[in-house]
Amino acid sequence: MNLRDNYPQPYTIHDARHWVEFNHKFNPAQNFAIEFEGKLAGAIGAERGKDELRTNMELGFWVGEPFWGKGIATEAVKLYTDYIFDKFDIQRIYAQVFDFNGESMNVLEKAGYIPEAILKKGFIKRGTVGDLFQYVKVRGED
């Protein structure tokens, strides 16, 4: 699975309810479900940096396998990026991607994000160390 380890696996209805309740406190909203043809297809959200990094937000998203290959993630990232720059005093949005997740790298590039850095041996997942690719979209740079 391409999600971070703190993401519940399997993801239960209890987990979904907790996520919805947790997100009610944000105004403006920071996290959204991704809907496609009336069905939950995934989720997208961002977390603001703290202190000196408060002009940054880290983007995260997922789309369920039945919805892959339909352009849903790319469209969601584009719309969400515009929303974040409109609603928040943010200068940059970045996303970190495991080296084995080429699909997410493609989504980010199609949505206008550019490769910014490779964090060599930047993560460990399922006992394997790998590189972490960082993509960025900077306000006003297209």
Protein language model features and the residues they cover:
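Conserved GNAT-fold acetyl-CoA-binding loop/helix
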Residues: M1-E21
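Short loop/turn motifs at secondary-structure junctions and domain boundaries
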Residues: F22-P28, Y113
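Proline-rich low-complexity regions
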Residues: P8-P10, P28, T74
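Acyl-donor (CoA/ACP) binding surface of acyl/acetyltransferases
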Residues: N31-D142
